[in-house]
């Protein structure tokens, strides 16, 4: 919509292969929401004690998330605050579907996908986040290492 032109599901290049390894890339914008999250990453859904999602968490691909102890994270909107996930569990959201041009698992039917989404909405996502009028925000937080890498790329831009 013209009144809210940010569309969060547009894919942009996040890394470039150079000499056998990948270098993270970032797209910068005057609109904070349009700045991309660089590099290969993992996305986890974090669940509170009630079993509902409290946030999603982005980490670099190499990072391991351990929720056995309080896990420090960065809220990109308030990075100066020291925040921790405590008494939480997590689930990695991304799954490898294609490798070397070949499927790694059979495709799901439309009905399987529909059923999976309905189950998630019913048992994992707060009703307050699902309403159309004044929905609560679903937070997207970052590991400290991932946040530092993103800020380093932003601060080292030429121009």
Label each region the model flagged.
Residues 2-159:
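Gly/Ser/Thr/Ala-enriched C-terminal appendages of enzymes
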């Amino acid at each position: 919509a013209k009144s809210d032109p940010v569309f969060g599901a547009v894919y942009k290049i996040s890394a470039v292969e150079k000499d056998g390894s990948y270098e993270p890339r970032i797209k910068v914008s005057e609109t904070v929401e349009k700045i991309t999250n660089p590099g290969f990453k993992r996305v986890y859904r974090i669940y509170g004690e009630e079993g509902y999602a409290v946030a999603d968490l982005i980490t670099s691909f190499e990072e391991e998330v351990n929720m056995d102890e309080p896990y420090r994270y960065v809220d990109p909107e308030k990075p100066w605050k020291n925040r921790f996930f405590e008494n939480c569990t997590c689930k990695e959201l991304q799954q490898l579907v294609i490798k070397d041009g070949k499927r790694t698992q059979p495709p799901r039917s439309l009905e399987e996908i529909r059923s999976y989404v309905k189950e998630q909405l019913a048992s994992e996502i707060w009703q307050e986040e699902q309403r159309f009028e004044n929905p609560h925000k679903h937070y997207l937080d970052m590991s400290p290492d991932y946040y530092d890498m993103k800020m380093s790329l932003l601060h080292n831009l030429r121009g």
